Amino acid sequence: MWKHYLKCDGSPDPSIAQEMNTFISLWEEETNETFEQVIEKSKLVLSLIKKLKLILLETPSCDLGDKMVAQHQGSILRLQELLSQKVDVATELLLREASTLADLDSGNMEKIIQDENVTLYVWANLKKNPRYRSVKFSGTQIGFEIPKILATSDVALRLLHTRYDHVTPLFPTAVPGEERAPIVEEEFRKEKSTEKAVSTEKALSTEKAVSTEKAVSTEKAVSTEKEATSQDEEAELKQDREGSLVPEKEIISEALEYNEVPRISYQEDENAEATKYELEMRLLSEAVSAAQLHLVKNIVELPDILENEVDLFHFSTLGGVYHLDILALPPQYKPVKGWVLVEIRQEGLQRFPYPPENTDEPDPESAFPPIEVTLEVDENVIFFEDPQVIRWDAEGKLWRTDGISCVVYDREERLITFNLDTLGPVTLIQDTHINMPYQSWELRPLGVNRVLITVTTLFTELQIHIKENLCMLASIKLRSQEHLSHLEGKWMRPVPFIMALKEAGVNIFPTVYSHFYVVVNNKVPMVEVKAYRQMALLSSAFAFRWSKWNMSCNSSRVVFRVKEGLAEEAEEHLWALLMFSGDRAQLLKIREDSEVFSEALKEETEFHSTLYHMVKDFASPEAMEKVRHSDCQFIDSVCHMLLSIRVLSFS
């Protein structure tokens, strides 16, 4: 979070729990904030939530730990709940002065407050005219068709369009502890035991040195005492000395060994440091492998889905959430002799129940018909097919498809109209896998540490430019005039870039559940991971492309085309067919336009253990020089993008 410290803007560091708790507590104490003030504060709140989500997504689970993951998710939930509470309080303050903001023509109050993240539409029914049943907000086609009972009641209609989704429950982003690679935990135990053994050996050496010092000093004292004795005891002393020669030699030998102790300990320290470094590197490698394998693994079983429940593994919510509410109109301000009086109710903003839970009407459906709603679809979201409308079930904490009827979508005007049995949060969904499987793909170098990934689907062709550790949407081709101007040309790190594309409706990133909804060319996870690693390593100088023969080989092998990227010619004969099994790479004798698949080795070529060693057989010195000068962050970014798109399994 070095960038955070450089800003010095007084905002809390989302990675520090104490700062987040202080920020939330101080904001809770602020009261009577207007809607404009809440919207302004929400910019910081949404930024903190986004940073917390990025921490959870970008940081390896072994570095965060379950406690830290729970802490960050708790901070996200608290911020979301507090922001919702602040919006309700600000809405109540606005509705209290509805009479002073009333329109001169209709006599009712209408208010629109807009921001890049939030748009508020509020209509207060002050006149209660039974013939005034069509509510359209000025300058828009957004509005409601309300029944007579609402047209004659003290109610207000609120449409709060948030371009973020704080309704859908957070899904865990960390890998559960039991799914981590066992070898990682084993190596941690080995490292601890090695450090313990080294420290024990040092302690024994120190203890041995101390005992040697004591023995030498004792011998010197004895010799001095013997020289001071009388001459008549000389023979006896001589005999005593002869009898003590062996222990003396042992003591001297121990003293000499003691002099060598520092040298031996220094060597042991060096060996221990080298062993520790090797262990750390191995642990890091295993942790990275576990994280990469997690990106390409497939869940064995789908969770149970209730009737009319939206399967969020199959569909994605897009365009934010439309919070539709019928509110009880609060007491209005009353000017009295220069004073303004208002009744303050402690229960706060109240929802108006529609239809009521208990009714004596013989035909409730005719007395309380559905409410017609017209909404505008977010212009920064692409729907490749007509969107579906779903509603939030607050009691069950899930999205549902029932209670919605007569859906009409106007693609040209980007308007969607539907009937809703009861108002509440609604959103639009699209099939998550609408652009899967891919029709083709290509990874092409643009220079050292620069590549272009092209993915062609049924509905679109998009190009992703990767430079060093940053990604950018270079172009996107669509059937209509829609385009993602807010994303094109904007450089982002891989994880935020993937999030931005998903939120825009352009999803080419499979999940662990995607194989249930897409016909995939499933490959062995480790083979797929190793292939992406090798492709990323060579991507500065070599181009890779989709091959139809990848469907013909078994799951333990992948087939794709390769050529040196320095060659400017576009002839098809420059592309070679390559087959890789994770531990063996070979060029195939067949070509892309051959009629029958064969694993026969190409003439005058050899088997190799990696793609790197294989391409060295035909690559130019300039190409291999580019590979050697590739930046590690660039290689990691390309590898992460390939692992996220999974071109070998979903093409």
Where on the chain are the PLM-derived regions?
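Noncatalytic interaction/regulatory regions of large eukaryotic proteins
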Residues: M1-F383, I404-Y409, R414-L415, N419-S651
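Short beta-strand elements bearing conserved aromatic residues within extracellular beta-rich modules
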Residues: P387-Q388
